Amino acid sequence: MTLKFSVERLVDSEKESEEADVEEQNNLKKLEEDEEDDELCEKSGKNEPLSQTLSYFDVLLPHVQMACSNPFISGIGASGSGDQNLNTGAGGSVWQHPWLELLQSTTAAQFGDVTAGLFLQPLRKNKRIRTAFSASQLIQLEKAFEGNHYVVGNERKQLAAKLSLTETQVKVWFQNRRTKHKRVRLEGSDPNAPMSNDEDDEDDKKSVS
């Protein structure tokens, strides 16, 4: 009985020892694999180029270069006033952001101050081109206005074609003429006085504003 118990205990201890050895070998193997993975990661990290991701500057620069090649912007840097505008503003400099400073310094050699002007110039509404009506056109428009203060639809289309004008030009002229008619009537002047090109230009500015 005692011998049997001793043999079983010896066998069990040998199994436990073998299992411990196997587990230790597995742990050692896993540790070696982890070390190899760490070395590979370090090597790949050293060899990997830094410019894998695009910064905001990288994305913005091509658009700036394309805009600078626009012939309509080429006169900005040569006007002479651009340099003065670039150095004004709060704190003595308008280039308060680091990326703007980087953009300016990088592109200044190639594009001058044109690049800076792209960021600093405020958005402006396109100025409406003044229509210079001829004397005969003004006479015909005044006659049409005497007959009807509101010319719309086919009547406006026919009048524009007759005077070699666009419908928009006729529409704006009638708007300005009605404005003058109301104004002179309030002032006690002659509301039927014809409107000159200068008066048309002034009323046009008021209607646009």
Curated annotation (Swiss-Prot):
It comes from the Eukaryota. Residues 15-24 have a biased composition (Acidic residues). It is found in: Nucleus. GO terms for biological process: brain development; central nervous system development; neuron differentiation; regulation of transcription by RNA polymerase II. Residues 1-46, 181-209 are annotated as: Disordered. It holds the Pfam family Homeodomain. GO terms for molecular function: DNA-binding transcription factor activity, RNA polymerase II-specific; RNA polymerase II cis-regulatory region sequence-specific DNA binding. Can substitute for ems in D.melanogaster ems mutants, partially rescuing the mutant phenotype. Residues 126-185 bind DNA. In the anterior pharynx, expressed in the I3 interneuron, the NSM and M3 motor neuron pairs, the three m2 muscle cells and the three e2 epithelial cells (at protein level). Its main location: nucleus. Residues 1-14 have a biased composition (Basic and acidic residues). This is Homeobox protein ceh-2. Belongs to the EMX homeobox family. PROSITE patterns: HOMEOBOX_1, HOMEOBOX_2. Disruption phenotype: Mutants lacking the homeobox domain are viable and fertile but proliferate slightly more slowly than wild-type due to retarded larval development and reduced brood size. About 20% appear starved as they are shorter, thinner and paler at all stages with severely affected adults bearing only a few eggs. M3 neuron activity is decreased. Keywords: DNA-binding, Homeobox, Nucleus. It comes from Caenorhabditis elegans. The keyword DNA-binding applies.
